Amino acid sequence: MSSGGLLLLLGLLTLWEVLTPVSSKDRPDLCELPADTGPCRVGFPSFYYNPDEKKCLEFIYGGCEGNANNFITKEECESTCAA
């Protein structure tokens, strides 16, 4: 392959990398956990990242236990998990 062809290939690969969305491999593992209200029943509006829908959704957190996929604001959820 000529040097011009290699340069074109390198440019196309670079463009592909820039335009490809961040994959789930780049997200923290906690973003893959399901929403977990926990056993308590206080009822705090919270947000979790839904990997199937690829967005942060609201749920009601009971106030104790649960898991790490639990954010006070949608913005915090998006900055941690959304690509």
Swiss-Prot record:
It holds the Pfam family Kunitz_BPTI. Transmembrane segments: none annotated. Residues 31-81 form the BPTI/Kunitz inhibitor domain. Gene3D superfamilies: Pancreatic trypsin inhibitor Kunitz domain (4.10.410.10). One of its GO terms (molecular function) is serine-type endopeptidase inhibitor activity. Residues 1-24 form the signal peptide. GO terms for cellular component: extracellular space. Expressed by the venom gland. The record marks 41-42 as: Reactive bond for trypsin. Keywords: Disulfide bond, Protease inhibitor, Secreted, Serine protease inhibitor, Signal. InterPro entries: Kunitz_BPTI, Kunitz_BPTI_sf, Prtase_inh_Kunz-CS, TFPI/VKTCI-like. It comes from the Eukaryota. Disulfide bonds join 31-81, 40-64, 56-77. It is found in: Secreted. Belongs to the venom Kunitz-type family. Serine protease inhibitor. This is Kunitz-type serine protease inhibitor microlepidin-1. It comes from Oxyuranus microlepidotus (Inland taipan). The lineage of its organism: Eukaryota, Metazoa, Chordata, Craniata, Vertebrata.
